Design a protein with these regions (language model features):
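Helix-to-loop junctions at the C-terminal end of transmembrane segments
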Residues: 52-64, 252-264, 348
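Cytoplasmic helix-loop-helix junction between adjacent transmembrane helices
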Residues: 95-131
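Extracytoplasmic gate region of multi-pass secondary transporters
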Residues: 20-21, 199-242
């Protein structure tokens, strides 16, 4: 599959995956869901991802990443369209498991395909891939505007149809034969045991898990916080999510350029976590919506490139294990997104969403400490640079 279609599909995958945040109040109203029940939808995404993980452990040795991408995009498209054509809470919960099932391999497969098949361009392609995700998430806040209220299911159908059209086009429009041969050449792999035995890899992955849990909390609950506690209009609610993802998108786009100028991923990640944690901790104390939006954007911007920086850095430690590293990153994200957003809703029900967001900033500070340990251990271990 050409990189262009990997980026384009990932853009609309981001829209589909992030529909819950700006539509959650509409879903709660039409389906009579409580705050914790809507938080369960986020956890069910990760349950589907874990099921997909178990299957991928077998398939990753049998099929190429691009083949798996086509399969899981099909699963995602079917689930999205069925959400729009069916009704009932039980079926909605089941289909969210299916979305998580497809999303796991889409995320892992896209990163694995680019960092493996296009290894020589990974420092450019990986940040661009995650920029595509951020750009899609930015558009989500406005994509859903015609579908708020009782028409929220239509947004899922439209997203599914667009993904289907792009997938068909990716099979019709092929690169030149020479380019295909280069992209599809088998990638030599080594044992994954050295990766799992690396203390630095484990600590860095734990830091990423905390960040991805925090990112999911922000992406899901910042719009709800803006609407229910800051009492803002639907347009401002959508803008709050947009500011978060604009910050992420800009930093991810810049990270590719910064890396090419010789900057190292670990220091960038460390300072990003600390600044983002500070911005999130200050958010509940914002005296007006303008200051709140600035803090939201800063939170997204500072920690935004953490995922592509992680993949670029760890792939340089273990260049022949890129597919496995991509899978581990998704596992870490799955655990973080499963546990922490749900705990946030439980805390919010007994206090407030603003307080819960402030407490979740601790996750970013802890992640920063873990990255600092990895960075300092570079004096004695081979991996960190």
């Amino acid at each position: 599959m050409q990189p262009f279609f990997i980026f384009a599909l990932f853009f609309f995958f981001a829209i589909a995956y992030n529909l819950l945040g700006p539509l959650v109040t509409s879903i709660m109203e039409t389906n009579n869901l409580t705050l914790s029940q809507s938080g369960l939808l986020v956890s069910l995404l990760q349950v589907g991802a874990l099921i997909s993980l178990l299957l991928s452990l077998y398939l990753i040795k049998k099929l190429r990443q691009t083949t798996l991408l086509k399969i899981w995009y099909t699963v995602l498209m079917v689930a999205l369209i069925l959400i729009g054509l069916t009704s009932g809470n039980a079926l909605l919960f089941f289909l969210y498991v299916a979305i998580g099932f497809g999303a796991f391999m889409i995320d892992s497969g896209s990163n694995g395909a680019l960092s493996g098949d296009y290894f020589e361009k990974k420092e450019l392609y990986i940040p661009l891939l995650h920029f595509s995700y951020s750009a899609g998430a930015i558009v989500t806040g406005y994509f859903i505007l015609p579908f708020r209220g009782a028409a929220w299911r239509t947004a899922y159908v439209v997203a599914g149809i667009i993904l289907a059209l792009l997938l068909v086009l990716s099979q019709i429009i092929k690169p030149k034969e020479g380019a295909i041969a280069k992209a599809e050449a088998p990638i030599q792999t080594e044992s994954n045991l050295p990766v799992l035995k690396s203390r630095n890899f484990i600590l860095y992955t734990l830091a990423l898990m905390l960040y991805m849990g925090s990112q999911q909390i922000c992406a899901t609950w910042i719009p709800v916080y803006t609407e229910l506690e800051l009492l803002q209009s639907p347009a401002i609610v959508g803008t709050s999510l947009t500011f978060f993802w604009v910050g992420i998108a800009i930093s991810r786009l810049l990270s590719g350029l910064i890396l090419q100028r010789g900057f190292k991923p670990l220091p960038l990640t460390l300072w990003g976590f600390l600044v983002a944690g500070g911005a999130l901790a200050l958010l509940p104390f914002a005296s007006n919506i303008v200051l709140a939006l600035i803090l939201i954007a800063l939170c997204g911007f500072a920690a935004g490139p953490a995922i592509p920086l992680y993949i670029v850095e760890t792939s340089s430690w273990f260049p022949k294990n890129s597919a496995f590293i991509a899978m581990v990153y998704i596992i870490a994200g799955t655990v973080g997104r499963m546990i922490f957003p749900y705990l946030t809703t439980r805390l919010a029900e007994s206090t407030s969403l603003g307080y819960a967001l402030m407490v979740s900033s601790i996750m970013l500070f802890v992640a920063g400490v873990l990255v600092l340990i990895v960075k300092r251990s570079g004096r004695t271990e081979r991996a960190p640079r």
